[in-house]
Structure formats: C-alpha cells, structure tokens
C-alpha cells in the first residue's frame, strides 16, 4: 500500500496532461499570502494561457460579505518545487468584478510605472536583500534562543557556522534550492547579525519581475517553514534592545547608471530620493520606526544621508561604483515587511519620472 509520502510525491506526468496551478495572491493585511490550487490542461508556458479565478474576499479582509467576490488575474508563473513535474506556482493580482484593482493590489500601479516608455528605456535593475527571522512555533521566540531568555551578544552569528551560532540552516538551504528550481533569480543567502535571523537575495531582476520574484520567494519560504513547524517573521524589529532589526535593502541601477558617467546620474537620483525622504519612508514598511534608529547599521528615520561604504546611511554607494564611475546604489531604508511592488515602483518613479521639483 502506498504511504502518504508516496502519494504526495506521485508523478502524474505519465497518466494525464492535467497539471496543478497554485494561484497565489496578497491578502488583506498587505503582507499575508494566500493561495489555492486548480487543475488546468498543461503544459503552461505563459500566464496568458491561464484563466482568471475568484475567491471570497470577505474571508481575507478585502471585500464585504454582501459582495465578496474578488477576481484573480494571473501575472507570472514559476515551477512548483513542492509538486514538481509540470505543476506551477502562479503569482496573481486582485481586481473587483468590474476590473478595478482593489486597494491592496500594489502591483497594478507598479506595472504602470514600469511600462512607461521613459522607465522601460532605462531597464531598471533591482537586487533585493530580504531579511527574516525564524521563530519557535509555540512561543514566538527566535529559533535557537532559550525560551524566555537570550543568547550571547551579537558578534559571533553573522555568516557563522556551528550548532551554537547558526539556527535553521536546513530551512534556509531548502528555500535556496526550491527558489532556484522555481526559476526565481535568487542570488545568495547568509546568516544575519542577530541569531535566528537570515537573509536571501533576489536579483538582478528587471522592473516588475523583482516584485513578483520576492513575493513568490516569500511564499515558498512560508511553505517550507510550515513543513518544518517553524514560524516566519518579517517584523522589522522582532526583538527589542541591542539586537539588529530586519530590512529589505534594495539595490538599484538604471541603464544610464551602468554606463560611462553613471556616477553623476547616481548622485542626481540620490538627491531626488532625499527630497522625497518622508514619502518613501511612509511607504517602506510598517513598524520601520522601531528599526531605523541610527543604531544597528541603520540611519535615523528622520534623517536622510548617503555615503560610500556607509552602512549607517540611508543610501549606500559601493566602493566599486565610486572607483569605476558607474554602477548601482543601495537604498537601506525599506523594512523586511515592505511591499516590493511599492518600493521598486516608487524608486523608479522618483528617480526617472519625477523632475525633482
């Protein structure tokens, strides 16, 4: 008799042309992820081949009970690392039955920015460093920490190895490989300064795909931590006190920045970002004021400053970029729970479309 594991791993490719499409969307909090699956005829190579679908928005905080239908529009597809075969993950955004984007659909506005001819011509690249914390399920306390207590001070944990310094590496490595399988442009992982905290990087990704890839990478991580009985936290400051927070540093460049003379373009873009500091901070994640204190490798939330190789700045420029006179810069302000559609779209809009006045 087949075991549960056998059935979960059942290969359907020899017996049917049907595949399972897992539709993923962002829920009512703007940070929670929801999904449900449907059977479609495969293989699917483009989201345009997939039907729209719907869900009960009254159960996700996105619609009233008397008019609860929200419509899912498939926007990006990835290979499913859980079901494998030809099965897929589908990143969707959400609309009313009349075709209007619902308030939590931030992808719609970002896609408009990225489709603007001036933005498209600049081919904006993003590399997003997604920090996160792994928590013990029943106590909501970081993995590897004594329950109700604290580990030794920060210092030994960043990029460390060893059972007393690195907690949750099996989850991190499983996520890394699952993202590569899915087709996400995940570029690396590392242990972070606070024990139980990790980071993965996605990019360089062009335009709207950066947001799609971060959201699906988050979804895959949620699924893996679910399997491991661990809780994923994107809280930007999960533990009070002398512990690092969690951010989503966003590396950015345009075609003009990557070409000869690009350093002057970078400095002009940073000047624009400084003029809109308050607007960006307001959109860069909930609870970010607990993280951006001027300590623990952050700039104070009320102060905008930039510097070369300065991890205490709002914007950091790398030594290589300064030396070569072209390259990219890093916006260090976004919180770990930021919406990548909002952040990437806003950076492009401010630096490319806004005239600076």
Swiss-Prot record:
It is found in: Cytoplasm. Residues 19-99 form the GS beta-grasp domain. Gene3D superfamilies: Glutamine synthetase, N-terminal domain, Glutamine synthetase/guanido kinase, catalytic domain. Found mainly in the cortical tissues of seedling roots, and in the root tip. One of its GO terms (molecular function) is glutamine synthetase activity. It comes from the Eukaryota. Homooctamer. Plays a role in the flow of nitrogen into nitrogenous organic compounds. This is Glutamine synthetase root isozyme 1. It comes from Zea mays.
């Amino acid at each position: 008799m087949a075991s549960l594991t056998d059935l979960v791993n059942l290969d359907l490719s020899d017996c049917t042309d049907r595949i399972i499409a897992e539709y993923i969307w962002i829920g009512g909090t703007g940070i929670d992820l929801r999904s449900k699956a449907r059977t479609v005829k495969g293989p699917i190579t483009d989201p345009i081949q997939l039907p729209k679908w719907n869900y009960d928005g009254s159960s996700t905080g996105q619609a009233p009970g008397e008019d609860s239908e929200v419509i899912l529009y498939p926007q990006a597809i990835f290979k499913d690392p859980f079901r494998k075969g030809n099965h897929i993950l589908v990143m969707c955004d959400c609309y009313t039955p009349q075709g209007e984007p619902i308030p939590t659909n931030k992808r719609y506005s970002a896609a408009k920015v990225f489709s603007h001819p001036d933005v498209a011509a600049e081919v904006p690249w993003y590399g997003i460093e997604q920090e996160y914390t792994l928590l013990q399920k029943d106590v909501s306390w970081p993995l590897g920490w004594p329950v109700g207590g604290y580990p030794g001070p920060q210092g030994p944990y960043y990029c460390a190895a060893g059972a007393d310094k690195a907690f949750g590496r099996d989850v991190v490595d499983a996520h890394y490989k699952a993202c590569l399988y899915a087709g996400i442009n995940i570029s690396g992982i590392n242990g972070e300064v606070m024990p139980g905290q990790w980071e993965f990087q996605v990019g360089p990704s062009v335009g709207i795909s950066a947001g799609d890839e971060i959201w699906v990478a988050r979804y895959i991580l949620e699924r893996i931590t679910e399997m491991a009985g661990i809780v994923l936290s994107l809280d930007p400051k999960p533990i009070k006190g002398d512990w690092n927070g969690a951010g989503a540093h966003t590396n950015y460049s345009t075609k003009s920045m990557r070409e000869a003379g690009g350093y002057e373009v970078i400095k002009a873009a940073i000047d624009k970002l400084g003029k809109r500091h308050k607007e960006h901070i307001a959109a860069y994640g909930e609870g970010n004021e607990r993280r951006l204190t001027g300590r623990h490798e952050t700039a104070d939330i009320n102060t905008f400053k930039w510097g070369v190789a300065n991890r205490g700045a709002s914007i950091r420029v790398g030594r290589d970029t300064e030396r070569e006179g072209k390259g990219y810069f890093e916006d260090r302000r976004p919180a770990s729970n930021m919406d990548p559609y909002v952040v990437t779209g806003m950076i492009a809009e401010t630096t490319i479309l806004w005239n600076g006045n």
